[in-house]
Structure formats: structure tokens, C-alpha cells
Swiss-Prot record:
Pathway: Purine metabolism; AMP biosynthesis via salvage pathway; AMP from ADP: step 1/1. PANTHER family: NUCLEOTIDE KINASE. It catalyses: AMP + ATP = 2 ADP. Keywords: ATP-binding, Cytoplasm, Kinase, Nucleotide biosynthesis, Nucleotide-binding, Transferase. This is Adenylate kinase.
Length: 191
């Protein structure tokens, strides 16, 4: 079973790369962001709670995010592995993910961190906001999301670095170049 994590600041391209990785390696994609947007659209109880946090540019509390993951693991019959898009975002979530995967006799093989400078992130997110009309892609919310990311998420890099599983990838290049770099790193795991 191959389990891969991919994270980076909002606008770093992790969703796009996650889709490409999922297709190439037949991994089940898990994007807590996508799950939450679906819950919000469907106006579920979880969706209403999540919407309040997202509209303020805040991360959901760990217990809610982990609940989403546990529910998903219970529903999905998967033996190839997972690609975790934007998860985990905190040390607590990383440890919970380790425990959940251990119950399935597997673990995270590699975690990619996409690095893009802040000006480029803001440019990408403002462009995306115009294209897709996402409420959370306005300048004030974007700046708050980037601050929250730096404060709460970057510690996860250190967690995986200490485990020898972190691979930093320059995310400013073309989608194709970034993907080629990622594929090379994954394939090197099996050589």
C-alpha cells in the first residue's frame, strides 16, 4: 500500500498535483478541503460548522477533521493506498493519521511540501477566485489563510522531516515540471 501526503500553502498547486498522483498510481484521493466544500454545499451539520471556520480563513478543529477521515476510512474499501491532499495540517492530525494507518498495517511513505513564494500564491488565489467564485479567495481571507498556514501547518513539515519522509518540491514551475519531479521522487522509493 502506497500512502502519500502532499501539502503546501493555499494556491501552491497541491490539489492539481494530488489529482495527477492519484491517477498515475491509482491512489484513493483524500482532500479534506473537497470533502468540506461538499458538506457545505449539501448543508449538512458538519458543513454548517465548517463554513463558519472557512469563511474566516481558519482551520477546522482537529477533532472535526479527524472525524471526517475516520468516517471516510470506514466507507472506503482500498488496498492500493491514499493520496492525502492538504492533510494533515497539525501535529495532532499527523499523529492521528499515523495511528489510523497503523490500524490498516501501513504508514505514510512520503510527504511532499510544495514551496511557492507568497506573492505568487496571492496572484494564483486571486485569479482562482475570479475563475471559480470561491468566497475564500478574496485578498483579506487569502492573507489570513496564509498566516494560519504558516502558524499551524508548517510544524507538520518538521514532524515528517524528523521521520525522514519529507520531500520539499519547488512549486513555482509548470504543472508538468512539478509533477515530473514528484514522480521521480516516488519512483526512487522503489529502486
Amino acid at each position: 500500500m502506497l500512502n502519500i501526503g502532499i501539502f503546501g500553502a493555499p494556491g501552491s498547486g497541491k490539489g492539481t498535483q494530488s489529482e495527477l498522483i492519484s491517477e498515475k498510481y491509482s491512489l484513493y484521493p483524500i482532500s479534506t478541503g473537497e470533502i468540506l466544500r461538499r458538506e457545505i454545499k449539501d448543508k449538512t451539520e458538519l458543513g454548517k460548522i465548517a463554513e463558519e471556520y472557512i469563511n474566516q480563513g481558519q482551520l477546522l478543529p482537529d477533532y472535526l477533521t479527524i472525524r471526517i477521515l475516520v468516517d471516510l476510512f470506514d466507507k472506503v474499501d482500498n488496498n492500493k493506498g491514499y493520496i492525502f491532499d492538504g492533510f494533515p495540517r497539525t501535529i495532532s492530525q499527523a499523529k492521528a493519521l499515523d495511528d489510523l494507518l497503523k490500524e490498516q498495517n501501513t504508514s505514510i511513505a512520503i510527504v511532499f511540501s510544495l514551496s511557492v513564494d507568497e506573492k505568487e500564491l496571492i496572484r494564483r488565489l486571486l485569479k482562482r477566485g475570479k475563475l471559480f467564485s470561491r468566497k475564500d479567495d478574496n485578498l483579506e481571507t487569502i492573507q489570513n489563510r496564509l498566516t494560519v498556514y504558516r502558524e499551524q501547518t508548517e510544524s507538520v513539515q518538521e514532524y515528517y522531516r524528523k521521520k525522514g519522509k519529507l520531500m520539499e518540491i519547488i512549486g513555482k514551475n509548470s504543472v508538468e515540471e512539478v509533477f515530473e519531479n514528484i514522480v521521480e521522487k516516488i519512483d526512487n522509493l522503489f529502486r
